[in-house]
């Protein structure tokens, strides 16, 4: 019947709590979990908060290995530079699903709704790291401060609570 709550890390998040995730390579499974949860919470340090998505990190795009070169060409049409993610030894990084990832580097922030729609219909694309409208809350850390940022779908995010002392257990 789904999950009550899912908490996951973020690679970037904007004021509307749209996020980029997947730099660890598990973006498809992360999105499935986020969709299954009644409440989805992002967590990360304050450097993950950005004015515009895709300004500090690339967009991970999980791609089938079959036909990957053609899919890479299609991704290039997005005015980005898709780079095959590799391991330290130079071999392609393979996801838990057996796919590869292209990290798409954008020079300018794209229209995210259009990008999301395009990637959803692009042959060979399994999933992408844009999490638009998924998050309900985001926790961010600033040195020894915990800030709870809450989603306002019509007006961005605002500070709900700030704790100057807390214990972080990992």
Segment roles from a protein language model:
Residues 1-142, 147:
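Conserved phosphate- and dinucleotide-binding cores of soluble alpha/beta proteins
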